[in-house]
Each structure stands twice: as C-alpha cells, then as structure tokens.
Amino acid sequence: LFLYCFIRDLPKNTLTVVAIFSPIFILYPLGEIEVLIRKEVFLFIGFVIFLILSSPKKNKTNSMFYVFFIFPLLLLIWEPFIFFIPFTIFILLINGDEHQLKKNVFKISLCLSSSFFTIIYIIINPLSPEQHMVMSNGLMDRFGEHCYTSCSLLKTKSSIAAQFMAVFNNITFTGFFRYFIIMLIGFFPLMILIYNSFFKKLFFLNKFEKLLIPFSITLLLPILLFTAMTDWGRVVNMIYTFSILTFLFLIKNDLIKLNDKVLYFDYLYKTKKKIFIILFYVFAFGWNPKTQIKGDIATNTLYKILYNSSKHMLDFKSKRLFQDSPLIKFHKKYIE
C-alpha cells in the first residue's frame, strides 16, 4: 500500500517501468516467498514513509523528526539497516538549503545521532549465551517454537568477526561471478536511467551535475554487506530496492531530468512491440536470484509467483502439479 501510494504518480516512460519490474525488486520476494517474512520488509516500509515525508511540498522538519525517532527502532529490528543510511543522507542533502551547507550538515548529524548511538550500543553489548538461552526458552514457552536458524545465528554470529568469517568460508569464484552477472543484468535498466539523469540544480557545492557520481558514492557502504551476509540474494534485493526507491523519489519530485536518449526505449516499444514484450518477459519473469550465496539462479519466476501465491491463499499444501512430466524433467536437467 505504501509503495503503491509512492509510485502511482510517477512520470511515465518505458525504461522506468522495466526498472520497476526488475526481478531483484518487487518480483523477487514473490519468487522467493520466504523473503516476505524477513526483517527487511520493515526497513522498506520505513524508508518509503521517510521518502513520502521528504517531499519538497511538505515541511522539511517532519522527515528529520521521523529519522530521529523511527530509525533507531528500525535498527533494533535489524542492525544492518545502518548500511543504508547513506540513502537517507543523500535525500536530506538534496532537500537542504545549498547555500547553508554547514547548517544543513549539522541538522542531518543531529537527526541521525539517535541512530548512531543505537548502533554503538548494539555493538558494545553483544548477545551473551545466557541471554540467548532466555530468548530461546521464551520462544518455546510462549509460542511453542524451537530456536531455528535466524534465532541460532544470534548466538553463533554475535561478534563482528563471525559475520565476515561465514562469507569467507562459503565464497567461491562461481558464486562471485554468478552474482556479478545478476547485478549487472538486474541493475541494467536502473543504471541506464541514472547515467542519463541530471540534477535540475547543481548538487553539493555545485560540484555535481550528473546523478551518477553521487549515487555511486551512496552505494559504497551498502555493498559492504556482501562481506557480512551469506544471503546474497537478499543483499542484492535490498540494495536495488533502496536504490530504485531513491531514484523514483528524485524523478517524482522533479529534482532530476532525464536525457532524451532514454526515450529510445519508448520508440523501441512502439516500433518493435512484439520483440520488446518477449525481451521484457524474459528479463522480468524468466529468472531470479536464490537467497543463499551458494544457490543457483532460479527460473520460471512467473510460474512460481502464481504457484506460491495460490498455494498460500488456497492452501494447496505444497502439492506440485505435473512434477513428473517430461517437460519439467527436461527443464530441471538442461535449463536450471
């Protein structure tokens, strides 16, 4: 609902629609259904609300008060949210008075101070084995639930060093290359848009005219999550989600303008509609990354979206139709 309210008034161009339907954005959790119950969903909702409050038409102090009081709660829900703070700083800098940079930086530092104190407190107070046992027993006593993977990771990966060791023990050249290609293809429409975007007024001490450089700087911290998480599919989804939401905010509020080269995709859609639709289908619904670093690329995303949605709404109880058919066997053996 928040996402719909945010994107419904966007300026229309074909490439933006393609970027929204990237398989590493809103289609990803529908293909990998377990992602819908992950903590990052709360981060996405919190960030969308921040973007709505950050509209130039609204009072600027509203978004700053929101950051001061709500962002620490998001950090308590999931600590790695701190890696995505640069997107917030980027938006606050754009909304600030460019002629009062020092004052603007002070305000941003002040509204983020609560988040920095929260993350420092979390770092210096890691979860002890005794506290983990209390939590584990509480899950069983109150909800009848065992301490499964996410709960046990709070114990085995409570230190910062343990976060990085898990990745180093699982990384392979194949996995690295696979996710490089995933990001290259998944980000391709958005990066074309960003490359062809220009600020309507010069940004940050009048040094930046194009969006590409400041946006690339914003991505430096989130990319570090690849060294601390083995769920690389989720990392790609989170980085892309924050990236495209930020871009959509800029274009929705008329803070950037697009180069006419982007209109080529509108021309391509009008003149070669059938070819364009086929390519769009393959790009958006033909594949998606798996959750784990060792997972291969999934296919038949559109089928999985329909199957997973129907299974949970109609209670199919995980019965797979046609699982022994020659077509499915051929797909598993030669395509997947």
Task: Set out the residue ranges of the language-model regions.
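Hydrophobic, aromatic-rich transmembrane alpha-helices
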Residues: F2-Y4, N169, F177-L205
